[in-house]
């Protein structure tokens, strides 16, 4: 789209424009991301729960097919996943992705990377700013520093 007689400030740092991220995991959203997006960010019916790697891999096949059909290089489209970071909590049931020990979280990061995810957006928020800051520091020291 082009607009005339419009001023937009501040100008974006990225050239020629900021990357366009397309969200959603429906087929139309995946097709849109493949046709015009720089990054696909699947957001499903339960935004707090990321797609499992197997389902994400299936959707990436579709994304790549749509990109090729649109004449685009599928490798040029990045993939982002929101990764809610959970405290270990109750270990009697199945472990949620991005919860548990630092080793388990690192393995989750690697699993999503292996599927094709290029960006993970971690959610460190809690009701207490100090606790949020502590979670970020712990993640930085125990997960990022080793990954």
Task: Show the residue positions of the predicted features.
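Active-site-adjacent structural elements that line small-molecule/cofactor binding pockets in enzymes
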Residues: 1-147
């Amino acid at each position: 789209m082009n607009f005339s007689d419009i001023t937009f400030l501040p100008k974006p740092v990225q050239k020629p424009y900021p990357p366009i991220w397309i969200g959603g995991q429906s087929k139309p959203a995946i097709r849109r991301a493949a046709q015009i997006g720089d990054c696909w960010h699947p957001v499903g019916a339960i935004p707090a729960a990321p797609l499992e790697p197997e389902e994400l891999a299936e959707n990436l096949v579709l994304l790549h097919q749509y990109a090729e059909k649109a004449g685009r290089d599928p490798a040029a489209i990045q993939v982002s996943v929101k990764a809610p970071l959970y405290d270990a909590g109750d270990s009697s049931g199945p472990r949620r992705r991005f919860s548990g020990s630092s080793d388990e979280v690192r393995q989750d990061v690697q699993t999503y990377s292996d599927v094709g995810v290029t960006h993970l957006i971690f959610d460190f928020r809690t009701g207490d700013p100090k606790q949020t800051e502590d979670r970020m520091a712990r993640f930085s020291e125990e997960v990022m520093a080793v990954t």
